Swiss-Prot record:
PANTHER family: 39S RIBOSOMAL PROTEIN L12, LARGE RIBOSOMAL SUBUNIT PROTEIN BL12M. Homodimer. Part of the ribosomal stalk of the 50S ribosomal subunit. Forms a multimeric L10(L12)X complex, where L10 forms an elongated spine to which 2 to 4 L12 dimers bind in a sequential fashion. Binds GTP-bound translation factors. This is Large ribosomal subunit protein bL12. Gene3D superfamilies: 3.30.1390.10, Single helix bin. GO terms for cellular component: cytoplasm; ribonucleoprotein complex; ribosome. Forms part of the ribosomal stalk which helps the ribosome interact with GTP-bound translation factors. Is thus essential for accurate translation. It comes from Protochlamydia amoebophila (strain UWE25). InterPro entries: Ribosomal_bL12, Ribosomal_bL12_C, Ribosomal_bL12_C/ClpS-like, Ribosomal_bL12_oligo, Ribosomal_bL12_oligo_N_sf. It comes from the Bacteria. The keyword DNA repair does not apply.
Length: 129
């Protein structure tokens, strides 16, 4: 790929919103048959030792699963705060639930997002990565 073509691609990607970038990530995962998650190394248990407990996820995918019609305004406000989206983009995201809010978030941040959305009246799922 030429340097000019690469720079044009970088410029085009830089103009995408967070929501558009998340959709692009999903499309690329589907097209290439991959998952954009960091690999997790799991050590084998020592010989004769019992298997270790299940490793708890440190990163989570946060998905808005439900936004009741009578609670949408409050949920949109929280989504804007979390994602930095504009009013229209946040409204579109909330109305299209179930929709991914954050592709990757540390556990504390994911739980905080879940608490805020649930306080506003929505429902969220956290999927460990």
């Amino acid at each position: 790929m030429s340097k000019k073509k690469t720079e044009e691609l970088v410029d085009a990607l830089s103009e995408l919103t967070v929501l558009e970038m998340a959709e692009l990530k999903t499309l690329l995962e589907d097209k290439w048959g991959v998952k954009a998650a960091a690999p997790v190394a799991v050590a084998a248990p020592a010989a004769g030792a019992p298997a270790a407990a299940v490793v708890e996820s440190t990163d989570f995918q946060v998905t808005l699963t439900e936004a009741p019609a009578d609670k949408k305004i409050g949920i949109i406000k929280v989504v804007r705060e979390i994602t930095g989206l504009g009013l229209k983009e946040a409204k579109d995201l909330v109305e299209a639930a179930p929709k991914e809010l954050k592709p990757t978030a540390p556990k504390a941040e994911a739980e905080d997002i879940k608490k805020k959305i649930e306080t506003a009246g929505g429902k969220v799922t956290l999927k460990g990565l």
